[in-house]
């Protein structure tokens, strides 16, 4: 019943933003970037532009984000069953 979670890239412990890769197996991957909504509340935004993208597209997006911001944290969750539910709103 465990869901494997890995820190793929360690960012700045005080100010690094988070990119979350939810690996849904054959269904694809959801890539979510940590953002703030209009009220300043923490939220998530689809990084790949779509709800699910290919693993290759997810990795390309993540690499591009790390190149832009090396302080970024990247966390990957392997969840082909879709059990993990993101906390917070997706904008």
Residue ranges and their predicted role:
Residues 1-7:
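Phosphate-interacting basic helix/loop segments used at nucleotide- and nucleic-acid interfaces
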Residues 2, 15, 69-72:
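Sequence-level motif detector for i,i+2 pairs with an aromatic at +2
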Residues 7-39, 45, 74-79:
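Hydrophobic/aromatic-rich, well-ordered segments within soluble, folded domains that form packed cores
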Residues 35, 42-91:
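Helix-rich interaction surfaces within compact, conserved domain-sized segments
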């Amino acid at each position: 019943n465990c869901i494997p979670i890995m820190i793929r890239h360690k960012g700045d412990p005080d100010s690094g933003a988070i990119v979350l890769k939810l690996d849904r197996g054959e269904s694809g991957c959801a890539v979510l970037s940590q953002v703030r909504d209009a009220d300043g509340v923490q939220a998530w935004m689809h990084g790949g532009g779509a709800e699910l993208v290919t693993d290759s597209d997810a990795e390309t997006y993540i690499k591009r984000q790390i190149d832009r911001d090396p302080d970024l944290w990247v966390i990957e969750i392997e969840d082909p069953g879709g059990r993990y539910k993101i906390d917070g709103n997706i904008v």
